[in-house]
Amino acid sequence: MQEIEIFCDGSSLGNPGPGGYAAILRYKDKEKTISGGENFTTNNRMELRALNEALKILKRPCHITLYSDSQYVCQAINVWLVNWQKKNFAKVKNVDLWKEFVKVSKGHSIVAVWIKGHNGHAENERCNSLAKLEAQKRVKTTT
């Protein structure tokens, strides 16, 4: 299986409010950047949306190392998700996106690594800037 790195970040102005997401996918020396947003959302939803959209791009099963500054996403992937599924996602927030994650992550091996946000991590900073830009675009369209 190919070794892929995914860096992602989500932003929400107001939380909830206009939001944006961004992800960088890296395979060897190749990179692809994606971004987007929603008019009314939360930072956690945008973080997870970034990951889901990145996973949709992959065409074959991969070993993925995910780098995120979201404890929520990292803990969910590494620890909580198995129990959430056993309990059919009872009382889980953002259940639509977690169910989508289960679908789009099928066949992949994913390890989530938490990185401290706003701490000079180059890819995280790039994703953060893009996610904020996407959120700001939506402020202009919703006012």
Curated annotation (Swiss-Prot):
**This protein's record includes keyword Heme:** no
Co-factor binding comment: Binds 1 Mg(2+) ion per subunit. May bind a second metal ion at a regulatory site, or after substrate binding.
> This protein's superkingdom?
Bacteria
Gene Ontology CC: cytoplasm
Instruction: Enumerate the Gene Ontology biological process terms.
Output: DNA replication, removal of RNA primer
Cofactors needed by this protein, per the record, are: Mg(2+)
Q: Which GO terms describe its molecular function?
A: magnesium ion binding; nucleic acid binding; RNA-DNA hybrid ribonuclease activity
Indicate what this protein is called per its UniProt record.
Ribonuclease HI
